[in-house]
Structure formats: structure tokens, C-alpha cells
Curated annotation (Swiss-Prot):
Gene (name only): tal
Family per similarity comment: Belongs to the transaldolase family. Type 3B subfamily.
Designated name of the protein: Probable transaldolase
Pathway stated in the Swiss-Prot or TrEMBL entry: Carbohydrate degradation; pentose phosphate pathway; D-glyceraldehyde 3-phosphate and beta-D-fructose 6-phosphate from D-ribose 5-phosphate and D-xylulose 5-phosphate (non-oxidative stage): step 2/3
Keyword flag Cytoplasm: yes
SUPFAM superfamilies: Aldolase
Organism in which the protein naturally occurs: Lactiplantibacillus plantarum (strain ATCC BAA-793 / NCIMB 8826 / WCFS1)
Length: 217
């Protein structure tokens, strides 16, 4: 499973990229706006920190404008993936862009039919939103399982990015459900290596070693 960071904060990206465990980055207009800087500048900086895919979302709502934005965005760096919303206009754009060899990430996927349409349009990635679906009484992890089954059954190469990840449990469950990638907020990424029993075990080892050292004096 690949791990992407879901953030536009370059300091967070640098921090976690140093671990060698970050395979890519996803952004959206909300995340970029929080940085208070020019969109193009932020995206270009991110592409210089990580060599993997960096999703940059279009803001247009019409297919023609999405396509124009996408063609401009891919000029910024070779590892940019154009993020497209799951709408009828978005699907039109994905069909054209995929035909041009431009990688796309269809975002805001909440159903199997949406994911299937995106795959048929040629999307490189689809992003089902786990947390947001859970919020309305749905089951984000079940959606990932269902998407995995459909994509495999019909031979689509589209990869599943588990998005709207709320905690380590989502990451674990997405991996078990067959997601190719989890895109993870920095606050959640920093919790992945933590467990109360790990902390307890380390404290016990340290205490025992300290006691042993005292007997050697």
C-alpha cells in the first residue's frame, strides 16, 4: 500500500518525506487556501519535495475550462496529477485528458457507480471519501471493498485512493479492504506508529535496564 500526505503545508511534507515513507501528496482548494499563498507556487514547491504524484485540483466547473486548467497545471512539473471533481462535466474532462495521456484523480467519490464511471472515463485514480460517507451513516470501508471488487472484475487499472481519512483505524481498514493508496492528513500520519502498548513496553524496558545498570555499580 502506498501512503500519500493529504496536505498543502510544505513544512509537514518535508518532515514526513524525510522518513522515506511518503509516496505522494494530495491537495485541494481548501488545503491550499489555508497556506495563504499562490496556488501555483505552493504546488510547484510540493513537486520539488516529493518525486511521487502530486494531485492539484481544478477549480472550474465546466469541462472545457477544467481541461484548459489541467493542460496548464501539468506544465508546472512532471509529477502533477490533475484532480477532477466527480460530476458529469468532470467525467467529460477526464475522458479528454486521459486520451491525451494526462493523469487524473477523480475526487469526491461516494458510490460504486461514480467510481465505475470514473474508471470507464480513464481516471488514473479515484478517491472515495471514507470519513464523509461515515458521517451520513454510510460505510466508507465497504465502499472501498466494493470498488476493489468492481475494478478487479472488469480489469480496470484505476487505483483507489482512500481519502477523508480520520484516524489510524481508517488506514488499517482501507489497507485490508484493498485500497491501493491512503491519503493521510499530517495529524493522522503522525499517529500511525503510536500504540499505548508500545509506549508501555518501552517504559518497562527502560525501567528494567535502569535497575540492571544500578546493580552493576
Amino acid at each position: 500500500m502506498k501512503f500519500f500526505l493529504d496536505t498543502a503545508n510544505t513544512e509537514d511534507i518535508k518532515h514526513f518525506a524525510e522518513l522515506g515513507l511518503v509516496d505522494g501528496v494530495t491537495t485541494n482548494p481548501t488545503l491550499v487556501s489555508r497556506e495563504g499563498r499562490d496556488f501555483e507556487t505552493v504546488i510547484k514547491e510540493i513537486t520539488q519535495i516529493v518525486s511521487g504524484p502530486v494531485s492539484a485540483e481544478v477549480t472550474a466547473t465546466k469541462a472545457e475550462e477544467m481541461i484548459a486548467q489541467a493542460r496548464n497545471e501539468i506544465k508546472w512539473a512532471s509529477n502533477i496529477v490533475v484532480k477532477i471533481p466527480m460530476t458529469e462535466e468532470g467525467l467529460k474532462a477526464v475522458k479528454v485528458l486521459s486520451g491525451e495521456g494526462i493523469k487524473t484523480n477523480v475526487t469526491l467519490v461516494f458510490s460504486v457507480s461514480q467510481g465505475l464511471l470514473a474508471a470507464k472515463a480513464g481516471a488514473t485514480y479515484i478517491s472515495p471519501f471514507l470519513g464523509r460517507l461515515d458521517d451520513i451513516g454510510g460505510n466508507g470501508i465497504q465502499l472501498v471493498k466494493d470498488l476493489r471488487q468492481v475494478l478487479d472484475t472488469y480489469g480496470f487499472k484505476t487505483e483507489i485512493i482512500a481519502a477523508s481519512v480520520r484516524g489510524p483505524q481508517h488506514v488499517q481498514e482501507a489497507a485490508l479492504a484493498g485500497a491501493d493508496i491512503a491519503t493521510i492528513p499530517a495529524t493522522v500520519f503522525g499517529k500511525l506508529w503510536s500504540h499505548p502498548l508500545t509506549d508501555k513496553g518501552l517504559a518497562s524496558f527502560a525501567s528494567d535496564w535502569k535497575a540492571f545498570q544500578a546493580t552493576q555499580k
